Amino acid sequence: MANVVVVGAQWGDEGKGKIVDWLAEQADVVVRFQGGHNAGHTLVIDGTTYKLSLLPSGVVRGGTLSVIGNGVVVDPWHLVDEIARLGQQGVTITPETLRIADNATLILPLHRELDHFRETANATLRIGTTKRGIGPAYEDKVGRRAIRVVDLADADLLGAKIERLLAHHNALRRGLGIEEVDGAALKTELLAIAPRILPFADTVWALLDEARRAGRRILFEGAQGALLDVDHGTYPYVTSSNIVAAQAATGSGLGPSAIGYVLGIVKAYTTRVGEGPFPTELTDAIGEKIGERGREFGVVTGRKRRCGWFDAALVRQTVRTSGIDGIALTKLDILDGFETIKICTGYRLDGRIIDHLPASQADQARVEPVYETIDGWFETTAGARSWAELPAQAIKYVRRIEELIGATVALLSTSPERDDTILVHNPFED
């Protein structure tokens, strides 16, 4: 029996929600280990759609403990709202079903304001964030001035920490021409929300270590995609946290040996939200067709996603940087009916063929995709639950992806419904 880490292997929006829900039904504990409420998950269970952005997917499953790890930045006001919204759908969340790391960093209103200012002040410098304060909160964490969950329990210490925090932020805001933050007002806001957050606070690293030693199945739920990783992604058009599988250990307080099986979620084509390089992007009618069929709009922002052909070079890179053992291939049905389909196998840069996306921002913008073209299929793959139900050419496409990325398919998803899944290998049984 293995613990399982789920990571997006592209730029996010790969369909992790459905796969995580399928795995969460088998897990005892589901852990979020990075990011914040900037990445949405959509779950469809018995005809009901649940949209999550901060809470682990396990919250909609009775009998499963959900954990927000220390690697997550937590907006306490959003957390309260998300819990209330799920409550209206019949999902009850209590301290018995949800734990939050007491050493997790808080997102404050000043973080959201700074994020929004940076994204709107100069269009040429825009990264394409969700403007929800994620990046500025991580900056304060690394700068050793962050307010953490545990600080809400000590009013005197909280006041001192706010003073230290504002010594930095108000100097910055003066330089930017933004109104300064009143420390007393911020303290009042935090003390008001504290009673709704502190009951969930716990020493998460100890809780998870106990669960591991007891042989409980732990599912580590990644948000976004590894190509947005602050180190291994398309920098600077990335998020502000590490997303690769190794972060599951750091962001939860467990050792690397606790990770177990790494499952990469891979869409059968490629999408991206926001700015940044996208070698296989299709700006023509084909790209529009893929986007319309795949309903490619962000869960959190509603932004239209950019669409393109499958990029095997990028996914192969992620397989290596995350140590992916197997993949879950999603949205194969969106490619039904295409006469031909292209797969990017590498790039052309200055007359040379390279097999990975270079680190240089300038080179990333200049690479040209090298494609191979395969025949498509006209039969439907939607709703298939066995290999026998798939068209031969669709199987050929899947097998070619496996060859090019160096990882095998463990699960194949053919619709948003959780049961429309072809299981090849259960990651928990590795």
UniProtKB/Swiss-Prot annotation:
The keyword S-adenosyl-L-methionine does not apply. GO terms for cellular component: cytoplasm. IMP binds at D13, E14, G15, K16, N38, A39, G40, H41, T130, R144, Q224, T239, R303. Its main location: cytoplasm. It catalyses: IMP + L-aspartate + GTP = N(6)-(1,2-dicarboxyethyl)-AMP + GDP + phosphate + 2 H(+). Substrate binds at V299, V300, T301, G302, R303, K304, R305. It is an enzyme of class 6 (ligase). It is found in: Cytoplasm. One of its GO terms (molecular function) is magnesium ion binding. Its cofactor is Mg(2+). SUPFAM superfamilies: P-loop containing nucleoside triphosphate hydrolases (SSF52540). Pfam families: Adenylsucc_synt. NCBIfam families: PRK01117.1, purA. Homodimer. HAMAP family: Adenylosucc_synth. This is Adenylosuccinate synthetase. It comes from Methylobacterium nodulans (strain LMG 21967 / CNCM I-2342 / ORS 2060).
